[in-house]
């Protein structure tokens, strides 16, 4: 009989075989067995082993048998053994001798163990319970699981994994099934083990080809979650096949699982070995026998599912039939229960709800066709809510689901999965199985990419997206996968080096979001594939250095020089900026194509999203400059320069300039043919979680306002990131619209490298700290899916290490530069001497004529017609007002070949109905732009100039940023932005502070943008009075911009022309008039346009003409702007010859030489006053009060101020109070 006291049970043969090998050669046995085998004593056999014997002749056998003495047969012993087994059954039965030619062999090893074990099993009185369990839910959920694993990490879950785990859970409810019988001191005893150790029968093939069966145990199963159980299961099987099992693996099995169903057996009653209380058998999954001849369609129609037969063979001495039956019933219920499958899915990180068990719905197939179509529509509208896009999965208990996406919500069940329904062209078919429909829908909308396009109103765009998204994605080739991996290698290598070399330095690392590098690379590559000219990138500081190195191609040496604190020697002047704000330019070459494309990264400040409108303006300027093939095959502009804009999630949702910039997307004056937006969504804003930083479901919801498609993509899936990037470019090219990619990722470190994010986000960073990076995860996924081999992965790793080494080598060769104080940029650009801004009278006349050169049949508005006639009159006779003086400047520049762009709120007509640059037909609405006629010479040839004038949206931040960007993209253009009232320019203060006033000093980025800011105290209240002169003067330094407040149309004319023609790229700020627009004295004569140039300091005309006597003047009033006309009127009224008024037309840089020359003409002056309308703490005085005495200490050391009192608001809200204050200023000035 078997040695039932052995802890190895049916594995005893293997132990004995190992012992014999160990005895002959200890080195032939795994060292883990040595300690056990030294003390092992095998059970002695009852007979010596014999070699196989071939019987040569029946006759010899008969004679041998006859010669042997024969004992009479004993009567059979019918006494029952103590365990109820009839002893006679154990007696050897006489067997006829083998026939001639038969091969006779004594059974050894596993075969002998089977004999011994089976004989031993006869001592266990067993009974068997049988239960048929529906297998459909098991089959369907396993399909879902394995499809997800195939897409991600690879591997499979077997039916045995699931059944074994259900068995273990059932044992928890019925612990008696885990007991076994023994005798202690001759007394029958039931033993309840402390743990459930599940025995698995593993079929092994030896080197000689013979197969053997071992039973290894998974220990302490009741303590495991499903993922742990699967890991332990796979470990046992792997070590068994590798011959690495230890003594511990064989000992202590308490309950066994056998699966003869794998060979087609439907029902099995296995033998139960001593030492166990039960063995569970699993039969084959089959349809009921009576349906096995039915077609698949008929089976689906009837709702027939496969069954699996479970048997429980148990020791009847300690387990009763009711317990065994309930045990099987519990397994049955588990395999159909929601809770069991929820746990399995969570443990395997399957982000979707499992298929649910339900009864079949008897509704008609016609009704269900409609339900299937509703389900398809639901996935197209809501599928993104179920997409597996979060690489952190912080809420692991939450499934990605939505009621609209559940088949049960639509009156469908798992029984409908294999039924065929009408799908009306979905995925190119008229009829499909629901299973296939669901598979396609989930693949399209619910995997690592979530697509939002239901908000798009254009059916063509929606259909295009559906066709592209619902088509099976073409898997990248091995070469493409290796290329993606190489980009991840480069991204991670760069960050790893910086982290080790420059510990603690701020660099705003890309770690956790490395997939943005292959994503950007793919987008640029696709742009090159389309034959476009350039990609211009705008982005914040997060990951900027990585983009500079691995996308734009900025040399590592330059980047590391900046890390060392050295400015680029080519930018010796200026204050410079931190390394993660700088721009660069490079050339991108396709890896798998023959095209190339220019790539540039524009400089940015730390003000998040401020660069957005700047980028759009820069791109529009480049497009206008190229102007080649301006109409594509679809009759649209060929927008061959592509803006690629990166954002952070918190900033995209939180910064208002994002909405302002998006609003520009489809406007005629601002359209760039679509921007590719990539949101690096690390799911945190500094320390703020999304639930505190936005009210919307997604950070991208603001983009729905312009009908942009939105793609949410898992940053841990670089292949999905690459696919989405290419699709985004294709959509942009097809429809000339914005596209938004929301790449969900995480931030490996804090907001900067010195910050500890776990202080405020501990749970998130517990997850992040243990998470593999995208490069490692992708490598493992490629190997797990079988896409690349281990060798190829090792080659990629060597490439990664090689790139690290290359970085180190470049750093070693860096030359250190000595740090010097920064120098001013003021002297870098000087006004050329003798610059002429006057024009010929004939050009003035031509511009005047243009306003009456209306197209045939054009009817001007009756209130506009007199204005046009007056302009023609002024062009010939003089008395030119402010508005026409401005148009003369712009028109003359167009005639000289300049591109002139004017924009602003209501700028075509003018806020004060003064400009009328675009005329509207009173009856047809047709538009006519007179100054555009100046783009053609009198002989019909083009001048090369253009006049572009646009009414802007009601925006300052984005509008000013756009115009600034336009000047960066086209330095030769004359670009003007006009505020509706100067007060509102503070809506663009970030652009003024970060770009206009300091861009040259920080980045060497030049701009000649013009801001026209209506300014003046006229009693219209504090919000329609001041353009905040004091703020611009405070920002001025190093010649960073020109600030002017001209008081005559001709001086304004020359100021604009000087700015356009002097070759200096610096902004111009002009404080323009309001009431002075129609002031009768504020006019200029023709000679003022044809004979002189801009004058930064103006005297009164009486002194300039030699009429006034300067020697009588004892007081000088210095002033600017329209206040001059009020002072001049009061002087004339009071007949004050002792007082002169001098106008500073240019406020910065202060015209020191001109001012001195002017003041020196007045030899008897004793008092100097600065007179302004603005309060004492506003206007020019806060700067002039300090600067004028330093500028001319011999004259202006004692200069005094005349103004309103210091005020917190620019003016009073009462027009009557305004009039009183204005009178007080005049009275004091003439007191």
Curated annotation (Swiss-Prot):
User: Which Gene Ontology terms describe the biological processes this protein takes part in?
Assistant: tricarboxylic acid cycle
Question: Which Pfam families does this chain map to?
Answer: 2-oxoacid_dh, 2-oxogl_dehyd_N, E1_dh, OxoGdeHyase_C, Transket_pyr
Q: Which Gene3D superfamilies match?
A: 3.40.50.12470, 3.40.50.970, Chloramphenicol acetyltransferase-like domain, Multifunctional 2-oxoglutarate metabolism enzyme, C-terminal domain, TPP helical domain
Chain positions recorded as thiamine diphosphate binding sites? 542, 606, 608, 649-651, 682
Residues that hold 2-oxoglutarate according to the record: 581, 606, 1024
Q: What does this protein do?
A: Shows three enzymatic activities that share a first common step, the attack of thiamine-PP on 2-oxoglutarate (alpha-ketoglutarate, KG), leading to the formation of an enamine-thiamine-PP intermediate upon decarboxylation. Thus, displays KGD activity, catalyzing the decarboxylation from five-carbon 2-oxoglutarate to four-carbon succinate semialdehyde (SSA).
Family stated for the protein in its record: Belongs to the 2-oxoacid dehydrogenase family. Kgd subfamily.
What is the name of this protein?
Multifunctional 2-oxoglutarate metabolism enzyme
Q: What is the lineage of its organism?
A: Bacteria, Bacillati, Actinomycetota, Actinomycetes, Mycobacteriales
């Amino acid at each position: 009989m078997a040695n039932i006291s052995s802890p190895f049970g049916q594995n005893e043969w293997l132990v004995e075989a190992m012992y014999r090998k160990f005895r002959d050669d200890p080195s032939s046995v795994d060292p883990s067995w040595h300690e056990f085998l030294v003390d092992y004593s095998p059970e002695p056999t009852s007979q010596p082993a014999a070699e196989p014997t071939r019987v040569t002749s029946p006759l010899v056998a008969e004679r041998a048998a006859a010669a042997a003495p024969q004992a009479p047969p004993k009567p059979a012993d019918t006494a029952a053994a103590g365990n109820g087994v009839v002893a006679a059954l154990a007696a050897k039965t006489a067997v006829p001798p083998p026939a001639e030619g038969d091969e006779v062999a004594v059974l050894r090893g596993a075969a002998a163990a089977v004999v011994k074990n089976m004989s031993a099993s006869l001592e266990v009185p067993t009974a068997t319970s049988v239960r048929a369990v529906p297998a459909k839910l098991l089959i369907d959920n396993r399909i879902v699981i394995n499809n997800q694993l195939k897409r991600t990490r690879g591997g499979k879950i077997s039916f045995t994994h699931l059944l074994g785990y259900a068995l273990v859970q059932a044992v928890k409810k019925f612990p008696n099934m885990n007991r076994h019988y023994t005798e202690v001191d001759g007394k029958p005893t039931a033993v309840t083990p402390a743990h459930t150790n599940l025995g698995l029968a593993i079929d092994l093939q030896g080197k000689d080809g013979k197969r053997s069966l071992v039973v290894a145990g998974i220990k302490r199963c009741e303590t495991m979650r499903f993922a742990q159980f699967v890991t332990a299961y796979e470990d046992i099987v792997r070590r068994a096949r590798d011959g690495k099992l230890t003594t511990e693996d064989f000992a202590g099995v308490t309950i066994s699982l056998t699966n003869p169903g794998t060979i087609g057996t439907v029902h099995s009653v296995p033998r139960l070995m001593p030492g166990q209380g039960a063995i569970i058998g699993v039969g084959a999954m089959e349809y009921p026998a009576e349906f096995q001849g039915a077609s698949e369609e008929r089976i689906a129609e009837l709702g027939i599912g496969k069954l699996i037969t479970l048997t429980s063979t148990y020791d009847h001495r300690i387990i009763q039939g009711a317990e065994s039956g309930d045990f099987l019933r519990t397994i049955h219920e588990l395999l159909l229960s929601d809770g069991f499958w929820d746990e399995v899915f969570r443990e395997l990180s399957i982000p979707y709800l499992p298929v649910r068990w339900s009864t079949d719905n008897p509704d008609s197939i016609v009704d269900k066709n409609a339900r299937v179509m509703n389900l398809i529509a639901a996935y197209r509208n809501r599928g993104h809510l179920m997409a597996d896009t979060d690489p952190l999965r912080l809420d692991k208990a939450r499934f990605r689901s939505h009621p609209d996406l559940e088949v049960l919500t639509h009156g469908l069940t798992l029984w409908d999965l294999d039924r065929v329904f009408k799908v009306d062209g979905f995925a190119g078919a008229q009829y499909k199985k629901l299973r296939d429909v669901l598979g396609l829908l989930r693949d399209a909308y619910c995997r690592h990419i979530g697509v939002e396009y239901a908000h798009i109103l254009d059916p063509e765009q929606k259909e295009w997206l559906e066709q592209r998204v619902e088509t099976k994605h073409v898997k990248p080739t091995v070469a493409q996968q290796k290329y993606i991996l190489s980009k991840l290698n480069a991204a991670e290598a760069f960050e790893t080096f910086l982290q080790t070399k420059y510990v603690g330095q701020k660099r705003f690392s890309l770690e956790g979001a490395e997939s943005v590098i292959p994503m950007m690379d793919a987008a640029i590559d696709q742009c090159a594939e389309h034959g476009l000219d350039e990609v211009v990138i705008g982005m914040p500081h997060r990951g900027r250095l990585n983009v500079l190195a691995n996308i734009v191609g900025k040399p590592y040496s330059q980047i590391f020089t900046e890390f060392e604190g050295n400015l680029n020697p080519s930018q010796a002047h200026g204050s410079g900026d931190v390394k993660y704000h700088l721009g660069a330019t490079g050339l991108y070459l396709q890896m798998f194509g023959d095209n190339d494309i220019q790539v540039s990264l524009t400089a940015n400040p730390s003000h998040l999203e401020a660069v957005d409108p700047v980028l759009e303006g820069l791109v529009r300027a480049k497009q206008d400059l190229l102007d080649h093939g301006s109409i594509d095959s679809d009759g649209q502009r060929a927008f061959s320069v592509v803006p690629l804009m990166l954002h952070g999630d918190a900033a995209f949702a939180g910064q208002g300039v994002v909405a302002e910039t998006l609003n520009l997307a489809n406007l005629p004056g601002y359209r760039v043919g679509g921007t590719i937006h990539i949101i690096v969504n690390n799911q945190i804003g500094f320390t703020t979680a999304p639930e505190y930083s936005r009210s919307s479901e997604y950070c991208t919801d603001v983009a729905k306002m312009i009908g942009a498609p939105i793609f949410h993509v898992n940053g841990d899936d670089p292949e999905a990131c690459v696919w989405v990037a290419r699709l985004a470019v294709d959509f942009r090219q097809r429809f000339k619209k914005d596209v938004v990619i929301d790449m969900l990722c995480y931030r490996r470190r804090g907001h900067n490298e010195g910050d500890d994010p776990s202080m405020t986000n501990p749970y998130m960073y517990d997850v992040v700290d243990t998470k593999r990076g995208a490069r490692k995860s992708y490598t493992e996924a490629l190997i797990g899916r079988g896409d690349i081999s281990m060798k190829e992965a090792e080659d990629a790793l060597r490439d990664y290490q090689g790139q690290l080494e290359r970085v180190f080598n470049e750093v070693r060769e860096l030359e250190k530069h000595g740090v010097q104080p920064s120098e001013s940029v003021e002297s870098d650009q000087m006004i050329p001497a003798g610059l002429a801004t006057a024009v010929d009278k004939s050009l003035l006349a031509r511009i005047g004529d243009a306003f009456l050169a209306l197209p045939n049949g054009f009817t001007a508005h009756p209130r506009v017609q007199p204005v046009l006639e007056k302009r023609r009159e002024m062009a010939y006779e003089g008395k030119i007002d402010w508005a026409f003086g401005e148009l003369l400047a712009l028109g003359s520049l167009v005639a000289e070949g300049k591109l002139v762009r004017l924009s602003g709120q209501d700028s075509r007509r003018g806020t004060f109905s003064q400009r009328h640059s675009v005329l509207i037909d009173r009856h047809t609405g047709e538009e006519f732009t007179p100054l555009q006629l100046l783009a053609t010479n009198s002989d019909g040839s083009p001048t090369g100039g253009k006049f572009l004038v646009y009414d802007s949206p009601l925006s300052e931040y984005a509008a000013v940023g756009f115009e600034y960007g336009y000047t960066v993209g086209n330095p030769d253009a004359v670009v003007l932005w006009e505020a509706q009232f100067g007060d509102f320019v503070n809506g663009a203060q970030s652009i003024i502070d970060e770009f206009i006033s300091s861009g040259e000093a920080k980045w060497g980025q030049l701009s000649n943008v013009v801001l026209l800011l209506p300014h003046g105290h006229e009693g219209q209240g504090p919000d329609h009075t001041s353009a905040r002169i004091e703020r611009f003067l405070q920002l001025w330094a190093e010649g960073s911009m020109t600030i002017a407040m001209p008081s005559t149309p001709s001086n304004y004319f020359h100021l604009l022309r000087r700015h356009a023609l002097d070759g200096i790229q610096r902004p111009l700020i002009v404080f323009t008039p309001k009431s002075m627009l129609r002031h009768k004295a504020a006019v200029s004569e023709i000679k003022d346009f044809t004979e002189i140039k801009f004058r930064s300091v103006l005297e009164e005309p009486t002194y300039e003409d030699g009429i006034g006597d300067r020697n009588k003047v004892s007081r000088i009033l210095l002033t600017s702007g329209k206040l001059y006309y009020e002072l001049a009127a009061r002087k004339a009224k009071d007949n004050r010859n002792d007082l002169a008024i001098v106008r500073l037309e240019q406020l910065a840089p202060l015209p020191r030489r001109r001012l001195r020359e002017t003041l020196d003409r007045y030899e008897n002056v004793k008092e100097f006053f600065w007179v302004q309308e603005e309060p004492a703490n506003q206007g020019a005085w806060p700067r002039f009060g300090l600067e004028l005495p330093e500028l001319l200490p011999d004259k202006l050391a004692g200069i005094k101020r005349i103004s309103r009192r210091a005020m917190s608001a620019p003016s009073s809200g009462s027009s009557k109070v305004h009039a009183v204050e204005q009178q007080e200023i005049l009275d004091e000035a003439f007191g």
